[in-house]
C-alpha cells in the first residue's frame, strides 16, 4: 500500500507541473473550453490494464502523436458483476480496438513542446487512478468517488486526472470490491457440488463458469417447475371435465334403464291384451264367417256368368222360342160339347135332351147359346170363337207351360165320372 501512495504523490507533482495556473506548462491552454463535452457516467467498477496506463502516460510525457491502443472496457450488466452470456467475457478477453462512434476524445495541445494527443478515452470505465512511478510503470489507485458520478458534466484533462487520485487504503478496501450475494438455491447447489466461491468480486474464469452453471441449473429448475405446474393445471381441468362427463353418462344410463323397464311393462300389458282377445273370441264363429265370406265371393263372381233362370238370356240368344203345338190333353165332355155346338149350333138341343144336366152344364149351355147368337149376326160372321176364347188356354198356358221346351199343354179335368170320352181323347 505504501508503494501505491508513493506513486500517487509523484503523479500529483507531475500534474501540478503541467496544469498549475501560476507556473504550469499548460497554464495558458484553455482545455475546458476547447473540448467541453458531456461525459456519461456508467458503472465505476472497472479496471484498466497496466499496459493501457503505460501507453497513455508515455504519450502524455513523451509527446508522441500516437493513439493509445488499449481498449476501454464496459462493465457487465449482470447483478453479480459478470455476464450471463457464455459467449462474452469482458474481464478476461478485451473487445477489439474499434472505438464506439460517440466516444469522447481528449486533445491535449502543448505550445512549447508541440505535444498533441488525440486518443479514445472512456472516463466511466476508469475504476482507479493511473500514476507513473520512477521506474516507468503504472499502478492502480482508489475508486472514483460516487459523488462525482453524475449523468453528464464538463471536464478538463486536469479534472480527469485529478479524479483518479488515490484515496486512503481503507477506502480502497471498502469500495474497490463488490460483495457477492448468493441465494439459498445457489448455496445449496454449490455445497452439493463441493465448490466454494469468494464473497467478493472479482472472480476467476473457473469461478465464473461455476456460477453460470449453478444459475443455469436454477433457471432450468424454475422453468421445469412452471411447466409442471401448467401441466398439472391442464390435467386437473381434464379430470374435472371427465368427472362431469362421467356424471352425465351415469344420468343417461339411469334414464335408459328406466325406459327399458317401461318398455318391458308395456310389452307385458300388450301380451295380456292379446291373450284376452284370443280367449274371448269364438273360433267356430270365425270359421263359419270365413266360409260365408268365401261363398259370397264365389257367388258374386259366378252369378253374372250363369243366370240359368232368366228369360232375357233365352230371348237374347234365340236358342229357344215358344211354339204353340197341340199337346196331349184331356178334354171333358162339356168342353167338347161346347166346341161341337159352335160348329153345329142346331144339334146342341138334341144332345142336351139325351145327356143328363148338371148345374155346371146349364152355365155352359148359356155360354154356348150366347156364342151362337153372336155368330148368327151379320157383323160377327167372320168371328172365330176359338181365336177369341183364350181364357182357359191362357190360364193353362201361364200355369202349365214347359219351362225347358216352351211347349204349352192344356189339361182339363172331367167334372163327371163315367162320362164318355171326348172325340179328342185319342190325342193322348
Curated annotation (Swiss-Prot):
CDD domains: bZIP_CREB3. Residues 385-402 have a biased composition (Basic and acidic residues). Keywords: Activator, DNA-binding, Endoplasmic reticulum, Glycoprotein, Membrane, Nucleus, Signal-anchor, Transcription, Transcription regulation, Transmembrane, Transmembrane helix. Residues 67-83 have a biased composition (Low complexity). Residues 93-103 have a biased composition (Pro residues). InterPro entries: bZIP, bZIP_sf, CREB_ATF_subfamily. It is a single-pass type II membrane protein. It is found in: Endoplasmic reticulum membrane. Controlled by regulated intramembrane proteolysis (RIP). A fragment containing the cytoplasmic transcription factor domain is released by proteolysis. The cleavage seems to be performed sequentially by site-1 and site-2 proteases. The keyword Transmembrane applies. One of its GO terms (molecular function) is DNA-binding transcription factor activity, RNA polymerase II-specific. It holds the Pfam family bZIP_1. Its main location: endoplasmic reticulum. Residues 212-241 are annotated as: Basic motif. The chain crosses the membrane at residues 287-303. Gene3D superfamilies: 1.20.5.170. Binds DNA as a dimer. This is Cyclic AMP-responsive element-binding protein 3-like protein 3-B. The gene is creb3l3b.
Amino acid at each position: 500500500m505504501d508503494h501505491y501512495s508513493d506513486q500517487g504523490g509523484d503523479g500529483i507533482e507531475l500534474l501540478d507541473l503541467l496544469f498549475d495556473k501560476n507556473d504550469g506548462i499548460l497554464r495558458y491552454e484553455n482545455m475546458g473550453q476547447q473540448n467541453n463535452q458531456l461525459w456519461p457516467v456508467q458503472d465505476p467498477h472497472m479496471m484498466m490494464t497496466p499496459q493501457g496506463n503505460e501507453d497513455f502516460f508515455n504519450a502524455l510525457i513523451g509527446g508522441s502523436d500516437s493513439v493509445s491502443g488499449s481498449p476501454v472496457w464496459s462493465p457487465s450488466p449482470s447483478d453479480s458483476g459478470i455476464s450471463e452470456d457464455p459467449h462474452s467475457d469482458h474481464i478476461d478477453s478485451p473487445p477489439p480496438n474499434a472505438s464506439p462512434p460517440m466516444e469522447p476524445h481528449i486533445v491535449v495541445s502543448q505550445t512549447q513542446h508541440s505535444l498533441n494527443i488525440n486518443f479514445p478515452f472512456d472516463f466511466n470505465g476508469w475504476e482507479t487512478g493511473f500514476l507513473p512511478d520512477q521506474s516507468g510503470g503504472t499502478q492502480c489507485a482508489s475508486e472514483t468517488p460516487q459523488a462525482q458520478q453524475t449523468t453528464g458534466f464538463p471536464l478538463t484533462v486536469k479534472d480527469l486526472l485529478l479524479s483518479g487520485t488515490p484515496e486512503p487504503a481503507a477506502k480502497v478496501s471498502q469500495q474497490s470490491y463488490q460483495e457477492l450475494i448468493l441465494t439459498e438455491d445457489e448455496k445449496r447447489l454449490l455445497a452439493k457440488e463441493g465448490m466454494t466461491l469468494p464473497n467478493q468480486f472479482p472472480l476467476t474464469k473457473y469461478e465464473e463458469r461455476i456460477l453460470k452453471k449453478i444459475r443455469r441449473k436454477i433457471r432450468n429448475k424454475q422453468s421445469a417447475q412452471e411447466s409442471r405446474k401448467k401441466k398439472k393445471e391442464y390435467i386437473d381441468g381434464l379430470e374435472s371435465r371427465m368427472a362431469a362427463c362421467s356424471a352425465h353418462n351415469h344420468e343417461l344410463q339411469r334414464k335408459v334403464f328406466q325406459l327399458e323397464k317401461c318398455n318391458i311393462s308395456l310389452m307385458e300389458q300388450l301380451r295380456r291384451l292379446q291373450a284376452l282377445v284370443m280367449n274371448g273370441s269364438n273360433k267356430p264363429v270365425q270359421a263359419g264367417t270365413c266360409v260365408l265370406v268365401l261363398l259370397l265371393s264365389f257367388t258374386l263372381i259366378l252369378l253374372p256368368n250363369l243366370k240359368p233362370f232368366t228369360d232375357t238370356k233365352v230371348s237374347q240368344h234365340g236358342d229357344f222360342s215358344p211354339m204353340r203345338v197341340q199337346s196331349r190333353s184331356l178334354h171333358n165332355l162339356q168342353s167338347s160339347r161346347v166346341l161341337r155346338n159352335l160348329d153345329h149350333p142346331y144339334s146342341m138341343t138334341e144332345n142336351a135332351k139325351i145327356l143328363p144336366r148338371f148345374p155346371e152344364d146349364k152355365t155352359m149351355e148359356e155360354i154356348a147359346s150366347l156364342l151362337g147368337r153372336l155368330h148368327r149376326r151379320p157383323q160377327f160372321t167372320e168371328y172365330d170363337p176359338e181365336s177369341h176364347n183364350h181364357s182357359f188356354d191362357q190360364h193353362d198356358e201361364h200355369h202349365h207351360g214347359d219351362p225347358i221346351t216352351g211347349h204349352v199343354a192344356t189339361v182339363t179335368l172331367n167334372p163327371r165320372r163315367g162320362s164318355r170320352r171326348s172325340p179328342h181323347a185319342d190325342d193322348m
